[in-house]
Amino acid sequence: MAIERTFSMIKPDATKRNLTGAITKMLEDAGLKVVASKRVWMSRRQAEGFYAVHKDRPFFDELCEFMSSGPTVIQVLEGENAIAKNREVMGATNPANAAEGTIRKVFALSIGENSVHGSDAPETAEQEIRYWFSETEIVG
């Protein structure tokens, strides 16, 4: 098993409902360690940059509007197979398809307001972590 890092974000729908602690606890209970964390209210421009990979998708404008509508909590998580573990704990993107006990099954309001985001691959994790954090902000 490899120790790796991944990017995790608690989205505005969850921060507005004061779920940051409950979600972080679920991640930590799964064996993931928070090695960096900050609360950020994204500008529209930051949201567009972060989600640039989706710029040609029909949901892009709505996504950027939502992500800049309130605070997010962005984190770097570390642990054995952290990327896969984080995705397992988050659950399927659509909460209707998420397994019982996952973050999205428990907390998501809809497919759009699904409470969390997490990197899907090592390359994505590296890009997303670098987008928000400097090396000196990550303390393992």
Curated annotation (Swiss-Prot):
Recorded hits in PANTHER family, A to Z, give: NUCLEOSIDE DIPHOSPHATE KINASE
Q: Where in the cell is it found?
A: Cytoplasm
Q: EC number(s) on record?
A: 2.7.4.6
Cofactor list: Mg(2+)
Give the main localization category: cytoplasm
Job of this protein: Major role in the synthesis of nucleoside triphosphates other than ATP. The ATP gamma phosphate is transferred to the NDP beta phosphate via a ping-pong mechanism, using a phosphorylated active-site intermediate.
Q: Which residues form the active site?
A: 117
The record, for Pfam families, names: NDK
Question: What keywords are annotated for this sequence in UniProt?
Answer: ATP-binding, Cytoplasm, Kinase, Magnesium, Metal-binding, Nucleotide metabolism, Nucleotide-binding, Phosphoprotein, Transferase
Supply the name of the protein: Nucleoside diphosphate kinase
Q: Reaction catalysed?
A: a 2'-deoxyribonucleoside 5'-diphosphate + ATP = a 2'-deoxyribonucleoside 5'-triphosphate + ADP; a ribonucleoside 5'-diphosphate + ATP = a ribonucleoside 5'-triphosphate + ADP
Q: Which family does it belong to?
A: Belongs to the NDK family.
Q: Which organism is it from?
A: Chelativorans sp. (strain BNC1)
| Gene name per UniProt | ndk
**A GO cellular-component term linked to this record:** cytoplasm
- The protein's enzyme class: transferase
Q: Which GO terms describe its molecular function?
A: ATP binding; metal ion binding; nucleoside diphosphate kinase activity
Q: Report quaternary structure and partners.
A: Homotetramer.
Which residues are involved in binding ATP? 11, 59, 87, 93, 104, 114
Q: Which GO terms describe its biological process?
A: CTP biosynthetic process; GTP biosynthetic process; UTP biosynthetic process
Q: What SUPFAM superfamilies does the annotation carry?
A: Nucleoside diphosphate kinase, NDK (SSF54919)
Spell out the InterPro entries in the cross-references: NDK-like_dom, NDK-like_dom_sf, Nucleoside_diP_kinase, Nucleoside_diP_kinase_AS
| Keyword 4Fe-4S recorded | no
